[in-house]
Every structure is written in structure tokens, then in C-alpha cells.
Amino acid sequence: MAAAASPAILPRLAILPYLLFDWSGTGRADAHSLWYNFTIIHLPRHGQQWCEVQSQVDQKNFLSYDCGSDKVLSMGHLEEQLYATDAWGKQLEMLREVGQRLRLELADTELEDFTPSGPLTLQVRMSCECEADGYIRGSWQFSFDGRKFLLFDSNNRKWTVVHAGARRMKEKWEKDSGLTTFFKMVSMRDCKSWLRDFLMHRKKRLEPTAPPTMAPGLAQPKAIATTLSPWSFLIILCFILPGI
């Protein structure tokens, strides 16, 4: 006899017919991405910020944050409404933790055949992307003086040397299972959660506040009753179904 479905997943299973109808009948939602660009200076000059983050949703700037002094420098209009939420606070807390971790690693980094033009500065792009088919992709890119040195694929935990000067850096970080796990979890768990929150917020802003009123006794139009908006479809595909 087949095992009964867990009560925890029944609400998710209940939406599958609607999801499949939307997939076949109304087209697929676009992919979406969330990027965090860190700039970490090992020995900053007087007045320089040692840690700054520039963030983008779908390649549009939404946050500039000094993670050294815990100060929001600027944010987009839509994000102002998220500022006082728990999710926003958790995001800033994690960005500070990432900045501190990167600073510690930078202090102990040995680069070969590379002379920085100024104070040793690490530029890091951490990103998570939800593709149109619901696949979540996480990655890290590490650069010095604007030149790519090292890549990390969070999905398969693979390190790739782009610049020969990063060979020792790659060997050291690859052996550090704690660091590898940290990078994977931030980009695949935390970043994914933040992207979900931003998409949900944007979805609420774009959807009408109330459905069209209808005369009593009239059947609800099929397009309303059985389809999902692209935003709803993407959120379900990327953030709900993977947990089934």
C-alpha cells in the first residue's frame, strides 16, 4: 500500500493542477536574479570604508550598504517599505557576517604573479538566480583590481581558477570545508530566501488590490479560476515546490 502524503505537503500538492495549467497554457515566467557585490579593502586608508556592498535585483540597484559600520547608504523606493521587517534585518546581519569572513580570508591570502595597484582590494560577487524552469543557481566570483581570479559554483561546490595568481588561494579555500559550506549556504539558502521576499513584495505591488467584482450567480471566468500570474508561477516553482 502506498504511503499517505505528509499533511505538511498537502497544501503544496493541492496547487499542482493550477501550476501545470499555467505552465502549458499561459507561458513561462522569466528568470530572476539577486546579486551582492562586495568590496573588501584589507588595509584601508584613512576615511576609506573597508567593506561596502552594492546589491541588485534583476540587475537593478536596490541597496548600497556599508557593512563595516552597519550603515545603509542608499536604497530603492520599493525597498524602503521592507526596511523595518525581520527579513531586511536578517539580510543586513548576514551581509555583515560575509564581509567580516571575507576580510579575514583576505588578510591570509597569497596571490602569485600579481602586484596590486593600491591597497589589496577584494571584489566579490555573490549571486543566486531562479531560472525559468525553477532551477536555483548560486555562485561566487572573486576579483582583484577588477580582474577575475577565482569562481565558486555553489551547486556542485566546484572551484575554478581564472587567473594563475589564484592557484594557492584556490588550493587553500578548497581544503577548507567550513568555508566552502559557508559560501554554499549563503548563496543557496539565504540569498534564495531574500530573492523570494523581494519577488513576493514586488508581486504584491504589481497585482490589483482586489479582484473584479462579478454579478451573483455568474461563473468565475476560466482564466481567473485556473491560471496563475507569472509572478505566482515563478514563486511556486522556485521556492515552494522544491520543498515537497
Swiss-Prot record:
Residues glycosylated per entry: N37
Gene field: ULBP3
Protein name per its UniProtKB record: UL16-binding protein 3
Membrane topology annotation: Lipid-anchor; GPI-anchor
Keywords tagged on the record: Cell membrane, Disulfide bond, Glycoprotein, GPI-anchor, Host-virus interaction, Immunity, Lipoprotein, Membrane, Signal
Pfam families named in the record: MHC_I (PF00129)
One function term, GO molecular function aspect: natural killer cell lectin-like receptor binding
Further facts: UL16-binding proteins (ULBPs) are unusual members of the extended MHC class I superfamily. They do not contain the alpha 3 domain and lack a transmembrane domain.
Ranges for region MHC class I alpha-1 like: 30-118
Annotated source species: Homo sapiens (Human)
Subunit and partners: Interacts with KLRK1/NKG2D. Does not bind to beta2-microglobulin.
Family label: Belongs to the MHC class I family.
Protein role: Binds and activates the KLRK1/NKG2D receptor, mediating natural killer cell cytotoxicity.
Domain of life from the UniProt record: Eukaryota
Region of interest (MHC class I alpha-2 like), ranges: 119-209
GPI-anchor amidated glycine-type lipidated residues: G217
Disulfide partners: C51-C67, C128-C191
Gene Ontology CC terms, in alphabetical order: external side of plasma membrane; extracellular space; plasma membrane
Span of the signal peptide: 1-29
Propeptide: 218-244
